[in-house]
Amino acid sequence: LPICVEAEQVEETNCYCTEEAEEKIKKLIEPYPAKGIHFLDSGNYHYVTKFWMEKLTKPFALVLFDQHTDMQEAAFFGLLSCGSWVRAALEQNELLEAVCVVGPPQKSIEEVFKNSKEEPWIDKVCFVSQEELEVRRQTAYDRFLKENSIPVYLSIDKDILREEDASANWDQGKTSLEELLALVKNCFEKQTIAGVDICGENAKKEGNWEASEVEKNNKTNLILLETIGQWMKEQEVNR
């Protein structure tokens, strides 16, 4: 049965997460395992993925479907943020051995390599750009799935999707829901999935909130939940 963890009362969490807020969120999700499908709300809270991954006790890889790299350097006194959490996880989680990010524009990927080329974790990272997805050239992803031999944690930000399939509060990609599901299915067929989370709701903005946006996201969420949930059940049965 679905479980709703209420975190609205936790302050200092929107985009940036203070250490005090981090402790409170971790306490809220403490009773629950990483294995499952976790909905995180808007991309402003994508850093919660880092907390779920910290529950894993064996070496693992992260596959991230996202319009952004989420590998910025931490700003504002080193606070964890929705734009820096992947970098923070690579720096702090010794069990995270590989990361494959699918969806960012090529220019964003180039910025990561330019700004992080000396970082010890950079060789753990591979990318498939938005431009490569548009022409169905996902060589790095296919190679990752072929060579990776450890469990995978899957994280999906719906901002990778075109506007027909989702309404996010950040700039969006051009991938269709059907194309995203094909990529996720490929991962399930070739990897052991340690857990899944989904974010990308359209954070409520005054004067910019339509029922059609909520309905669109709810429809996509239901498809993701039912489809991925079925694949998780099948994987458990076939283990």
Locate each region found by the language model.
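Catalytic cores of soluble, metal-dependent hydrolases
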Residues: L1-L40, N44-A61, S84, E94, ...
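Adenosine ribonucleotide-centric catalytic and binding domains
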Residues: F60-E91
